[in-house]
């Protein structure tokens, strides 16, 4: 009960299945909330790359609502409630403890947080109790993280992992990449894609 492979032969059905797993099936059937599920892909591009998956997962898990803060940056709209990743080391950024008096400096490549508030130009992100306010010139340090590449997930672990294994270049589906992806899951791994 800790591993499943769901065969899907095309990108859209794989993406639809991954969205359904995050939104409905794993929370309802396995008791795993969506915020404890991490979707991984070996690639950023293609039909099951992180770009396509992040768009589909944001639409399903965090759709726009009246009054919900949004901030466009490039081709992405950050929204209150989005899961995001710090993608660049920034030793100079100030963080403060959520609800406390502690503060410190530095956010690091791979840190994952949740957008808590968007107020005009400022995007406030909570990284597991460390709160950072991003100004417009800092938004390039953030990427959506509903889905992340296997490479970016190295060193992290998640309660449940959904791994997209469809239409990747052969080198991106190597044994070492698969091993890295599989070992990110603490309790459950679901692979979605082509079993050929």
What do these predicted ranges mean?
Residues 1-105:
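Conserved helicase motor core of P-loop NTPases
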Residues 101-102, 109-196:
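C-terminal accessory regions
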């Amino acid at each position: 009960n800790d591993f499943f492979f769901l065969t899907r032969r095309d990108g859209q059905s794989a993406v639809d299945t991954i969205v359904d797993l995050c939104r409905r099936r794993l929370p309802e059937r396995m008791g795993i909330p969506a915020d404890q599920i991490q979707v991984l892909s070996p690639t950023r591009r293609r039909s099951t790359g992180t770009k396509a998956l992040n768009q589909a997962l944001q639409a399903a898990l965090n759709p726009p609502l009246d009054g919900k803060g949004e901030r466009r940056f490039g081709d992405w709209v950050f929204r209150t409630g989005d899961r995001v990743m710090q993608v660049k080391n920034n030793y100079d950024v100030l963080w403060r403890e959520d609800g406390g008096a502690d503060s410190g400096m530095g956010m690091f490549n791979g840190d994952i947080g949740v957008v808590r508030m968007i107020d005009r130009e400022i995007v406030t992100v909570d990284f597991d109790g460390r709160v950072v306010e991003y100004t417009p010139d800092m938004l390039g340090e953030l990427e959506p993280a509903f889905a992340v590449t296997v490479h970016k997930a190295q060193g992290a672990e998640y309660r449940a992992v959904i791994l997209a294994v469809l239409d990747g270049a052969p080198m991106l589906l190597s044994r070492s990449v698969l091993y890295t992806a599989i070992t990110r899951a603490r309790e459950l791994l679901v692979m979605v894609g082509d079993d050929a």
